[in-house]
Amino acid sequence: MEGPGAGSGFRKELVSRLLHLHFKDDKTKVSGDALQLMVELLKVFVVEAAVRGVRQAQAEDALRVDVDQLEKVLPQLLLDF
């Protein structure tokens, strides 16, 4: 059984649109499996960013996560992915 918010995530249409914004050739297509994989990857990336942001805020004794904490964890997060 999955936890709270398990049904939330990125819509395939949104991810497809984001990918196509960066393709040089307009005829480039993305298979359904590749699209599903990108949806899952983005979901994991965002959750991991949130968790690391919370840990950084706790280390700084901050009561809430701010963009400053996310900016501090982003370089290592990008290297890990």
Curated annotation (Swiss-Prot):
Q: Which GO terms describe its molecular function?
A: DNA binding; double-stranded DNA binding
Cellular compartments per GO CC: chromatin; FANCM-MHF complex; Fanconi anaemia nuclear complex; inner kinetochore
Keyword annotations from UniProtKB, A to Z: Acetylation, Cell cycle, Cell division, Centromere, Chromosome, DNA damage, DNA repair, DNA-binding, Kinetochore, Mitosis, Nucleus
Q: Which GO terms describe its biological process?
A: cell division; interstrand cross-link repair; kinetochore assembly; replication fork processing; resolution of meiotic recombination intermediates
Query: Which InterPro entries is this protein grouped with?
Result: CENP-X (IPR018552)
Main location, first listed in the record: nucleus
N-acetylmethionine PTM sites in chain numbering: 1
Its subcellular locations are:
Nucleus; Chromosome, Centromere; Chromosome, Centromere, Kinetochore
- Record-annotated disulphide pairs: none
Q: What does this protein do?
A: DNA-binding component of the Fanconi anemia (FA) core complex. Required for the normal activation of the FA pathway, leading to monoubiquitination of the FANCI-FANCD2 complex in response to DNA damage, cellular resistance to DNA cross-linking drugs, and prevention of chromosomal breakage. In complex with CENPS (MHF heterodimer), crucial cofactor for FANCM in both binding and ATP-dependent remodeling of DNA. Stabilizes FANCM. In complex with CENPS and FANCM (but not other FANC proteins), rapidly recruited to blocked forks and promotes gene conversion at blocked replication forks.
Can you tell me which family this protein belongs to? Belongs to the CENP-X/MHF2 family.
Query: Whom does it interact with, and what assembly results?
Result: Heterodimer with CENPX, sometimes called MHF; this interaction stabilizes both partners. MHF heterodimers can assemble to form tetrameric structures. MHF also coassemble with CENPT-CENPW heterodimers at centromeres to form the tetrameric CENP-T-W-S-X complex. Forms a discrete complex with FANCM and CENPX, called FANCM-MHF; this interaction, probably mediated by direct binding between CENPS and FANCM, leads to synergistic activation of double-stranded DNA binding and strongly stimulates FANCM-mediated DNA remodeling.
State the protein's name: Centromere protein X
- What is the scientific name of the source organism? Pongo abelii (Sumatran orangutan)
This protein's gene is called CENPX
